[in-house]
Curated annotation (Swiss-Prot):
One GO cellular component term: cytoplasmic vesicle lumen
Pyrrolidone carboxylic acid sites (modified residues): 21
Protein name listed in UniProt: Neutrophil gelatinase-associated lipocalin
Annotated source species: Mus musculus
Keywords tagged on the record: Apoptosis, Cytoplasmic vesicle, Disulfide bond, Glycoprotein, Immunity, Innate immunity, Ion transport, Iron, Iron transport, Pyrrolidone carboxylic acid, Secreted, Signal, Transport
Gene name of this polypeptide: Lcn2
Predominant localisation class: secreted
Pfam family for this entry, one: Lipocalin
Family per similarity comment: Belongs to the calycin superfamily. Lipocalin family.
Length: 200
């Protein structure tokens, strides 16, 4: 049980590691936060609520081995101190019910940038940053995640939707954004929608 929770945590932190040999030896370098767009005038109250994970791109993602993934949802609950309690809801493998993963995103000095709260709970994580790159708040968001774990830098971009389906144009925009950060087609995957768990 503890092992499966740890594996889930690593996946959601951007370490979607494949079973392929040498999957992390040649990671695409993570970009500096300064080179990643930041949503102007970020409005934390409008960003809160449920988002569906429509797409993922990252330097530990491999389409040729993962293909696609089952959609999950993430709920951002705004707190009085402008941090978010963030809950991701996933479908467990083999009809084992729903899985919930809760963490805290603490605002940094720039609106739309966050760090992981309670870092002591994640001893393998040396740093963890979240940056809202772009959003219209009511349809889509693209969020950049970067972490250092065991002296390796991982990054991912998540394409969120307020609904389970997004237009081909938004998916193409997401793909272009991921490639602008050095990722390739093989590092970009899209989810398969589900009605299990993620609307809870």
């Amino acid at each position: 049980m503890a092992l499966s929770v740890m594996c889930l945590g690593l996946a959601l932190l951007g370490v979607l590691q494949s079973q392929a040999q040498d999957s992390t030896q040649n990671l695409i370098p993570a970009p500096s936060l300064l080179t990643v767009p930041l949503q102007p005038d970020f409005r934390s109250d409008q960003f809160r609520g449920r988002w569906y994970v429509v797409g993922l791109a990252g330097n530990a993602v491999q389409k040729k081995t993962e293909g696609s993934f089952t959609m999950y949802s993430t709920i951002y609950e705004l707190q009085e101190n402008n941090s978010y309690n963030v809950t991701s809801i996933l479908v467990r493998d083999q009809d084992q019910g729903c899985r919930y993963w809760i963490r805290t995103f603490v605002p940094s000095s720039r609106a739309g940038q966050f760090t992981l709260g309670n870092m002591h709970r994640y001893p393998q994580v040396q740093s963890y940053n979240v940056q809202v790159a772009t959003t219209d708040y009511n349809q889509f968001a693209m969020v950049f995640f970067r972490k250092t774990s065991e002296n390796k830098q991982y990054f991912k971009i998540t394409l969120y939707g307020r609904t389970k389906e997004l237009s081909p144009e938004l998916k193409e925009r997401f793909t272009r954004f991921a490639k602008s950060l050095g990722l390739k087609d093989d590092n970009i995957i899209f989810s398969v929608p589900t009605d299990q768990c993620i609307d809870n």
